[in-house]
Amino acid sequence: DDRRLAMFEGVYSVPDGVSYNSYLLLDEKTVLFDTVDEAVQKVFFENVAHTLAGRKLDYVIVQHMEPDHSATLEGILMRHPEAVVICNKKTEAMIYQFFGADLKMNVQIVGEGDVLKTGRHELTFLMAPMVHWPEVMVTYDITDKILFSADAFGTFGALNGALFADEVDFFADYLKEA
């Protein structure tokens, strides 16, 4: 949770803060889905290291380049230079625009319907341009039927420790904004 912001990107009022959603899949291969904003980088890096528990990070899937999803990508790659960055062609160009042409990374470009097998899990990539940026893609875990949706279904507001939909009161927490 990030409650330090009054305005998100200097445009949107966020009186209830924001949350940054990055996910780590532990399988035969480890996969990080997006990163987070620099404001919470210290705890993010600590959480990733703790969850990996000494394992290497195999993949970083970059679904969206907005800074609240990607600002700590360079820091992750410095800590895990072995990680392969999975992204689409538009995202690759944007990564170098954001972080500079000298950023060291191993890249695997994916397109619509491509599949990455991580062990038990099979991840398929679906392009979702203009969810609100042109490079957005989402990742679907075929095995567990989970959609990692980038910004497609996002909302503002800190989660107050909640991780799952059934841990929040929809009417009290979200309907008031509608």
Residue positions per predicted region:
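Zn-dependent metallo-beta-lactamase
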Residues: 1-29
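Active-site environment of divalent metal-dependent phosphoester hydrolases
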Residues: 3-4, 65-70, 93-94, 132-133, ...
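Divalent metal-coordination and catalytic microenvironments
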Residues: 25, 34, 64-66, 139, ...
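Metallo-beta-lactamase
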Residues: 87-178
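Residue-level marker for buried hydrophobic side chains located in beta-strands
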Residues: 31, 61, 146-149
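Active-site beta-strand termini and strand-to-loop segments that position acidic
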Residues: 25-28, 118-119, 141-143
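Active-site metal-binding motif and surrounding structural segment of the metallo-beta-lactamase
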Residues: 28, 39-86
